[in-house]
A protein has these predicted regions:
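Short alpha-helix boundary/capping and kink motifs at helix termini
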Residues: 29-190
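Secondary-structure boundary elements
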Residues: 169-173, 208-213
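Non-catalytic protein-protein interaction scaffold segments in large eukaryotic complex-forming proteins
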Residues: 2-39
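Alpha-helix boundary/N-cap detector
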Residues: 20, 24, 34, 60-63, ...
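Charge-dense polyanion-binding interfaces
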Residues: 213-240
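C-terminal interaction module
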Residues: 241-322
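Active-site neighborhood of thiol-dependent amide/isopeptide-bond enzymes
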Residues: 193-194
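Short active-site loop/helix that positions an aromatic residue
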Residues: 197-212
Length: 322
């Protein structure tokens, strides 16, 4: 007689590995006891079994392009489905099921100071970064390397005449110049261009070598990450980076089982360069005023999940150094 589908030695490894019914019942009881005692046992089990694994934050290549600037200035500014400075928040509700709500985080409203300077002026050599170019995909660290690699014909010979020729390029748009200053970056001043990147970079290169002053005038947008606001945010929230695809699966189930509330948000743009879908990260927010969140934060930290508050501290420190 032919054996039934699913029977036989092929199923043996699964049957051997699968916990017996009494073992599952004992673990369920143990989990409930641990949860009542204030320890996130289900989350610990998910991490131990590899269902929830930490992913290291991978910053994008360090370049003079704005694609390397962490955009604290636009982070949590709101989208078509979410208001600015609000979290997608889950908390215990009816029948121990999580309920969804939007919670405002006032500290985010104070995180970045924005200032507009209409009659800004600087020298061309003060510009250290650019926003756009047809060569933006090249990972170039220093603005002086840009014309050497991508437009050598624009910087030879080194002369004031060659400098003047570059400055006449219409893509520079002298009457529409805009700049951005980011307090947490080492390069600080970026030209918010649409065109003319090769010619202005070449002109800057030649101005340095000929000693010629080239004044630039336009509008400056200054963004300052406020250390006091960072500290205030850190006093109220534990924040960790968790694989995005697991937040509303493994992590959600564990937090609902533990009856521990949490918030969810995106990362700041350009903070993390995911290599695959599995490497994509999002943030989970744990309110410090809730009694159960400290044990969750301790477990995530010990397991190696990136502590977002450390990232905030590092960038706030860079602001004070600059």
């Amino acid at each position: 007689m032919e054996k039934e589908s699913g029977s036989g030695p092929l199923n043996a490894p699964y049957e051997e590995c699968r916990p017996a019914l009494w073992e599952r019942l004992v673990y369920s009881l143990w989990k409930d006891v641990r949860h009542l005692a204030g320890y996130p046992e289900q989350l610990k089990q998910a991490i131990s079994l590899g269902a929830l694994r930490p992913v290291t934050l991978q910053p994008p290549p360090d370049t003079f392009w704005m694609r390397s600037v962490v955009r604290w200035d636009t982070w949590m500014n709101g989208t078509y489905c979410e208001s600015a400075c609000t979290l997608n928040y889950r908390s215990p509700g009816y029948d121990r099921r999580f309920e969804s709500s939007a919670i405002l985080v006032p500290e985010l409203q104070e995180l970045v100071c924005r200032e507009t300077v209409d009659n800004f002026s600087c020298d061309i050599t003060d510009v250290s970064g650019m926003a756009a170019s047809k060569s933006v995909d090249y990972d170039i660290q220093d603005i002086d390397q840009f014309p050497e690699l991508c437009a050598p014909e624009y910087i030879s010979p080194v002369s004031e005449l060659r400098l003047a020729n570059n400055l006449t390029h219409r893509g520079i748009r002298w009457d529409e110049m805009r700049f951005a200053d980011y307090s947490w970056t080492s390069r600080r001043l970026y030209w918010l261009n649409c065109d003319g990147s090769h010619h202005l970079a070449a002109a800057r290169y030649l101005a340095v070598r000929t000693g010629k002053s080239v004044p630039l005038n336009g509008t400056l947008y200054r963004y300052t990450l406020k250390p006091d606001a960072v500290k205030k945010l850190q006093r109220n929230w534990y924040i960790f980076a968790v694989p995005d695809e697991e937040i509303f699966h493994t992590f959600y189930d564990a937090m609902e089982g533990f009856q521990c509330p949490f918030g969810h948000s995106v990362l700041p743009e350009n903070l993390h360069a995911a290599q695959s879908c599995k490497d994509m990260l999002a943030l989970i927010w744990l309110p410090r005023w809730q009694p159960k969140t400290a044990s969750v934060a301790q477990l995530l930290a010990r397991a190696g999940f990136p502590d977002f508050n450390h990232v905030l501290s590092r960038h706030a420190l860079q602001t004070t150094i600059n």
